[in-house]
A protein has these predicted regions:
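Post-transcriptional modification and biogenesis factors for structured RNAs
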Residues: 1-129
Length: 129
């Protein structure tokens, strides 16, 4: 849908082979190659071995708005879990950290929604340049 070539999982991430994921994804999970890299640091290293820039999507003090993040070229977006977000190790390994600007009383988004917004922004840039 957004041109995702690979999925790296780390920590206690639920794999695409889990029956609940397969049901939600309506079978599309099998279309994107994936691997469980172990720790967030190992996942970051695997991303770097592929020559990708690592951009974490997380609300931190030093994060830049998503529309200003370095999403051009070959990039890997890192998102954390629903409860705890990106780990400190992953944030430290990231080339940049970006947040999704929001208006309203709630300052967080479901991880699937946040991922879709970040992927759409990355693709929008490719399509408009």
């Amino acid at each position: 849908m957004f041109g995702v070539d690979h999925l790296w999982l780390a920590g206690n991430a639920t794999p695409p082979t889990h029956k609940a994921v397969d049901k939600t994804a309506l079978g599309t999970a099998r279309l994107v190659p994936w691997e469980h890299a172990g720790t967030p640091a190992a996942a970051a290293a695997a991303v770097r071995e592929q020559g990708l820039r690592l951009v974490a999507v997380e609300l931190t003090a030093d994060a830049v708005p998503l529309h200003e993040a370095p999403l051009d070229g070959d990039v890997c977006l890192a998102v954390g879990g629903e409860d705890h977000g990106c780990s400190p190790a992953l944030l430290a390994a990231a080339d940049a950290v970006a947040y999704i600007p929001q208006i309203g009383r709630v300052g967080s988004l479901n991880v699937a929604v946040a991922t879709a917004i970040a992927l759409a922004e990355a693709r929008r840039r490719d399509w408009t340049t």
